[in-house]
Structures are given as C-alpha cells and as structure tokens.
C-alpha cells in the first residue's frame, strides 16, 4: 500500500507530496539505526555474555529454574546468550515490530525457538499470569535500554514497571548496576557551543564589537544533552577543574524509581578557573561484585587507554552549566546532578551534599530563542572569529559606495558585518518568527534597529515594498539554513537568488559568487562499522539482521549520502579531492540538469570505505570557504574537517565487510547529477571493478 507524505524540500524551499511505501519510516529507522554498531561492539557483547553466565549460575546454584526476561531484545542476542548459558526459558520483549519479526527468525535459525518467546510489545504492556505473556514472574532481568545519557531511552520507567509487575523481588539483573560520572572543566571551545561571544569586526573606523543581548547571557541554554565522541576533543581544548566524580548509581536488581532526584558530590577544585562545562559518561557492572565492567570513559579517564573500545551507539555527554562561574583551587564546592525520568542536567552549588539532596532544580529550558534556532555546531560557527574575519575581508572587496544589501541566511550576522563595513542600507530576511525575534534583539542591543531592516517572510515572497522600492546591489548569504541536513541543501540560496532576480539592480553582485561540490575517497578508522555486516556475533548467526539492514538501505538510501560530523570520526584520504559540480550564483538556476562523471584514482593503500562530499563557497574570486576539508591531507592522508558542519558520507558497501580484501581496485568511478526542478543531487560511486548504470 502506498501513502502520500508531505515533505518540506530543504533545497528548493517548497512543500512536496511524495508517494511512499506505508513502511517507509520503518525502513529509514532500520537503515539509520545503531543495530550493526551494537553487534560490532565486542566489549559490550563479551561483558553481557559473562554477566549473563554468572547470573544464570547464581540462580541455578540456588536450585531454581532460570527464567529470563529480556527487555529490548533487538536481534534476540542476549536471550540466545542466556539459553546457551543454561537458562530454562527466555521471554524476549521488543516493541519495534520489524525488529521483533527479525528476532523470531534469528532465534529460529539458531535453534532456540523452543526456549525463547519473542513478545512484540512495550515492556509496560507485558502481562503475567495463566493467560498472560509470562506464566510467572522472571528471576533474571536482562536489558539493554541505555543511550549515551543512560536514561534517555526510558530505562528508569521500564525498570520501575518491571520490578513492580514482571520480575521477582530478589531477581538477578544484567547489568547489575550503572554509575554516572562527571568531570567539571573550563573550555572556551565547548562553551562556544552554548553561548554567543562578542564578535569583533575590523572597519575603517577601528574595531566594532557585536555584543549578545542580555537574554542570551542569562539563558540556561538548550535542555538536551550534547552527545559527542569526546575522545576526538583534544585535552588542550579544556582545563580540568575537578577529579572524575561518581555522581550517582542505579542498582537494577532492586526496585528502581523514575521520580525526579538530585545527587550532589562535594569536590575540591584542582585549579582555579571558570566552571562552564560538565563532561559525563557512565559504566555498567554486569555482576554484583563489579568484576565485569563496561565503561564509556574517554581515554584520559581509562586505566588502560590501549583497551579503548570504539562505539557510536554509546558516546559521552557534554552538559553546559546554566551560567559560567568562577571557582578557586582548593576551595570546596558541590556539583549536583539532577534527573527526571528521561534527562540529566547539572548545577554548581556552594552548600554541602546533605543540604542538596532534597534540592530539586527544574530542568533548564531556553528562553532566549537562540538555542531553538542555532544548534551547538552553529553556535561554534558564529563564534569562530577566523571565519568572521574571512567573510569581512570578502565583504570589503564587494561593498561599493551606496550599496543596498539583502542578506539571506537564517539567523546570520552577515547583515551586521555589511552595515559596519559601509553598506548604505541593509535588509535581512528571516523566515521564522524565532529567528526574526532573535535578530531584532541582537540589532537592538547593538543600536542597529534603525540601521538594519528585518523582514519576517519567506524570501521568495519578497515584494518591492518590502525593500522600500529599492533595488539590491549586493545579495549576501553565508549560506546557512536551519532546514539543511546535507551540505548541498544550502543551495536553497541559489533558489532564493533566482526568485529575487527582479529585485536585483543591473550589475548586482552575489556573495558567494559560486559554489562547488567536492568529493574525496576515504578509509575510516572506525565509522565503517555502523554500516558493516556482522554475520556472526559471539557464535550466533545474525545474517538475518544484516539482510534486513541491507534491504532497508536498498529501499531508502542505497544511493544516498548521510550527514556525519567527520571531525568526530578520523579517516584517511585515499584519493585527491575532486571538484564534481560548480554552481554559478551570479546566474539564475538553469532549466536543465547538471551532470558529472569521472574516475578518482586512489593514491594511497587502504580500504575505500566511502566517498565524502562537501560544499565550498567562492565568496570572491580570491576567497573561498569550505564546509569540508580545511587543509590538504597530510602525507599519511589524515583529514582535517570543518568542525562546524556535517559532511556527507556515501558508503561503498563492497568494502564494508571486514573480510573484504585490502588490495582492492585502484580507482572509484562516479556519476553525480543535480536536478534543478527538485533540488536533488543523485549520485553513485562504484569501485572500478563495478560498472556504473
């Protein structure tokens, strides 16, 4: 059955109605899921297996039958481990229907159908009794309900319900315990992901300062955690202010509460500085003695950094304190971890832990609009002074006496740069109410409310009256739009340029003048694992899962690229970067598709895991900004990526299998096409052994 789905096209800006298979959202969820990554997480799998064996043995030693409840079974892997370890029966609960159906097939293929019952329900809907899903309560509780924040996938309510209704009072639990850790740091880089810094602009009259409104200064920020691969943040980017502090633990073998709580830990600062950021992670102990442990700690907090397990389904957390606060070395303070049933947040306090245990603080919520409009990388981008200087230098060469400027980018400070650098009049278009209000506040605090005109409408709908009857001599864009997911989605600027053509003066200049799409073939250190087939996992055949993911990838995105922040995922370039397509913003969008075909020669040995694509913008003939590679690759091919942007990754499936040979083809062929009518860029990359369609 087909269904019609409305979708806002991020490139053209139009609303499209697409005919989709009724299960299209299932396929996307499976295709972009972390199932493969979890199956490749050997440390996780081994520790779970060890913990399950120990739990089954403890129950058997009491002379009891081992009845296992596995919540969030996924592939059924943990249930199969339990039966292999000697469990008498397993009840495997999985709410996601396609996953539950796959688990049934995997369990059957591995010969465990007589000992594992897959229940396609949310665990809170599971019943116990003669006519229930379980005939009696289980005495072993096995779960994998955790995310990077530990509790973000509803672990606490699920455990709370299970202990009340589904398991025995003295049950064994795997994992047995989880502990959340925190470390207080000062970091200009990370703080720049949360607050707007004053921006300097060098003008002919000296330095001008763009200051943030007081509302942004006071705002506690976005309520959500920022989960990243913390191992890719250099220790030089932060100053440690505290030891690693165990903030709170959850014993999963006992009744768990999902009620809001606060846990305080007193510490003595290791250094004086500005307390700004809390780095946090957790570990899980699979047994009561804590001998079987799986940790998310970054390398500097590991006892043996050489044993570091890469994983993407569990990372580390960056939390921003509501306000930065000075602390003194040696002067005791308290760090408080607050949580409700799904979220964790932190505050810095002066009082003792005992006084804080009952102090519950409301979860911080953005009230300045900026954190709703700009995500963390966007804050970092706006705060990047080198980037601002780059745009300012380009603008100086473009501005002429009497310039009438129109700025088209979401929540951009380009309009302020244009004003300070001498534009006679500046208009800026903000499509959303949030960005309109935010920019009005920024202009007001900088005494620019009468100097820059903010227009709250979609740029395609601009009228001559909006521009006060004037013709635009300089059309500006970074370009940046909040709806963009892939690098080329910001080509929306070209569609805007085309729609406002009537408002441009003869000889009007557009900045950027042009854009280009670039690609390079890379070998990833680890990211390839998220799309790699597993085949066999701890002795269990999970090919059915591999096939399911492959089917969904073929259905949704076999020839699509996916956005990834590659500064978090090290890789080596195997080819030279290639310019694939060029887009001339001085001219309206052409009617005919733009195509490019070619072959990229591999210059370095390695596995061609995929092609990385990004955009570069030619601000002037002599000035270009890149959203991808920032510098030429080093001798070994190590890549340095723009940390403020996501790049697009097109995985080459033939090399993702760990058993694929290293000495593969020496070139990659490509075919890329830009479709002006839809704004889509279709692509195909193939190892030279294959032939492009």
Curated annotation (Swiss-Prot):
Its EC number is 2.1.1.321. The keyword Zinc does not apply. GO terms for molecular function: histone binding; histone H4 methyltransferase activity; histone H4R3 methyltransferase activity; histone methyltransferase activity; protein-arginine N-methyltransferase activity; protein-arginine omega-N monomethyltransferase activity; protein-arginine omega-N symmetric methyltransferase activity; ribonucleoprotein complex binding. Keywords: Chromatin regulator, Cytoplasm, Differentiation, Methylation, Methyltransferase, Nucleus, Repeat, S-adenosyl-L-methionine, Transcription, Transcription regulation, Transferase. The modification Omega-N-methylarginine is found at residue 32. Residues 14-345, 358-684 form the SAM-dependent MTase PRMT-type domain. It is an enzyme of class 2 (transferase). The active site is at residues 144, 153. It catalyses: L-arginyl-[protein] + S-adenosyl-L-methionine = N(omega)-methyl-L-arginyl-[protein] + S-adenosyl-L-homocysteine + H(+). GO terms for cellular component: cytosol; fibrillar center; nucleoplasm; nucleus. Its main location: cytoplasm. It is found in: Cytoplasm, Cytosol; Nucleus. Disulfide bonds: none annotated. InterPro entries: Arg_MeTrfase, MeTrfase_PRMT7, PRMT_dom, SAM-dependent_MTases_sf. The keyword Transferase applies. Pfam families: PrmA (PF06325), PRMT_C (PF22528). One of its GO terms (biological process) is spliceosomal snRNP assembly. It comes from the Eukaryota. CDD domains: AdoMet_MTases. Arginine methyltransferase that can both catalyze the formation of omega-N monomethylarginine (MMA) and symmetrical dimethylarginine (sDMA), with a preference for the formation of MMA. Specifically mediates the symmetrical dimethylation of arginine residues in the small nuclear ribonucleoproteins Sm D1 (SNRPD1) and Sm D3 (SNRPD3); such methylation being required for the assembly and biogenesis of snRNP core particles. Specifically mediates the symmetric dimethylation of histone H4 'Arg-3' to form H4R3me2s. Homodimer and heterodimer. Interacts with CTCFL, PRMT5 and SNRPD3. Belongs to the class I-like SAM-binding methyltransferase superfamily. Protein arginine N-methyltransferase family. PRMT7 subfamily. This is Protein arginine N-methyltransferase 7. The gene is Prmt7.
């Amino acid at each position: 059955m087909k269904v019609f789905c409305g979708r806002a096209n991020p490139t053209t800006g139009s609303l499209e109605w697409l005919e989709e298979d009724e299960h299209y959202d299932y396929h996307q969820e499976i295709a972009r899921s972390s199932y493969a990554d979890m199956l490749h997480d050997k440390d996780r799998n081994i520790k779970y297996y060890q913990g399950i064996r120990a739990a089954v043995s403890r129950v058997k030693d009491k002379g009891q039958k081992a009845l296992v409840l596995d919540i969030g079974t996924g592939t059924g892997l943990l249930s199969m481990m339990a039966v292999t370890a000697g469990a008498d029966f397993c009840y495997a609960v999985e709410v996601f229907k396609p996953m539950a159906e796959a688990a049934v097939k995997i369990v059957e293929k591995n010969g465990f159908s007589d000992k594992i019952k897959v229940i396609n329900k949310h665990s809170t809907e599971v019943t116990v009794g003669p006519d229930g899903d379980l005939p009696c309560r289980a005495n072993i509780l096995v779960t994998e309900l955790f995310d990077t924040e530990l509790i973000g996938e509803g672990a606490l309510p699920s455990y709370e319900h299970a202990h009340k209704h589904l398991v025995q009072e003295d049950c064994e639990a795997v994992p047995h315990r989880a502990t959340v850790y925190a470390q207080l740091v000062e970091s200009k880089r990370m703080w720049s992901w949360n607050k707007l810094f004053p921006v300097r602009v060098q003008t002919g009259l000296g330095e001008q300062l763009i200051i943030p409104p007081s509302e942004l200064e006071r705002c506690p920020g976005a309520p959500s955690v920022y989960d990243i691969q913390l191992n890719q943040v250099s220790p030089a980017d932060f100053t440690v202010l505290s030891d690693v502090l165990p903030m709170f633990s959850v014993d999963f073998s006992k009744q768990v509460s999902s009620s809001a709580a606060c846990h305080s830990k007193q510490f003595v600062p290791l250094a004086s500085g500005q307390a700004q950021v809390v780095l946090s992670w957790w570990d899980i102990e699979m047994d009561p003695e804590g001998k079987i442990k799986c940790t998310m700690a970054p390398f500097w907090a590991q006892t043996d950094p050489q044993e570091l397990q890469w994983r993407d389904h569990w990372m580390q957390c960056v939390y921003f304190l509501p306000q930065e606060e000075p602390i003194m070395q040696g002067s005791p303070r308290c760090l408080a971890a607050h949580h409700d049933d799904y979220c964790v947040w932190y505050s810095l306090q002066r009082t003792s832990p005992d006084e804080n245990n009952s102090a519950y603080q409301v979860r911080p919520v953005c009230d300045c609009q900026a954190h709703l409009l700009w995500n963390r990388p966007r804050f970092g981008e706006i705060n990047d002074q080198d980037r601002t200087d780059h745009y300012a230098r380009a603008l100086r060469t473009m501005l002429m006496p009497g310039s009438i400027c129109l700025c088209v980018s979401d929540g951009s400070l380009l309009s302020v740069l244009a004003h300070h650098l001498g534009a006679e009049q500046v208009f800026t278009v903000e499509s959303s109410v949030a960005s309109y209000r935010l920019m009005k506040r920024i202009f007001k605090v900088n005494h620019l409310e009468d100097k820059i005109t903010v227009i709250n409408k979609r740029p395609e709908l601009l009228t001559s009256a909006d521009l006060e009857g004037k013709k635009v001599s300089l059309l500006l864009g970074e370009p940046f739009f909040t709806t963009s997911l892939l690098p080329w989605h910001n080509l929306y600027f070209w569609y805007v340029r085309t729609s406002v053509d009537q408002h441009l003066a003869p000889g009007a200049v557009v900045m950027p003048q042009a854009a280009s799409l670039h690609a390079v073939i890379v070998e990833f250190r680890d990211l390839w694992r998220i799309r790699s087939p597993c085949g066999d996992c701890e002795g269990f055949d999970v090919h059915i899962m591999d096939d399911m993911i492959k089917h969904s990838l073929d259905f949704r995105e076999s020839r699509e690229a996916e956005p990834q922040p590659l500064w978090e995922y090290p890789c080596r370039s195997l080819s030279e970067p290639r310019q694939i397509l060029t887009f001339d913003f001085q001219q309206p969008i052409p009617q005919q598709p733009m195509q490019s075909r070619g072959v990229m020669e591999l210059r370095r040995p390695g596995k061609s895991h995929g092609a990385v694509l990004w955009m570069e913008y030619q601000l002037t003939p002599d000035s270009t900004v890149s959203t991808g590679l920032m510098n030429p690759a080093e001798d070994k091919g190590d890549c340095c990526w723009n940390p403020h942007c996501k790049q697009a990754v097109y995985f080459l499936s033939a090399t993702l299998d760990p058993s694929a040979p290293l000495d593969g083809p020496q070139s990659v062929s490509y075919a890329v096409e830009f479709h002006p009518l839809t704004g889509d860029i279709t692509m195909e990359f193939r190892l030279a052994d294959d032939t492009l369609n």
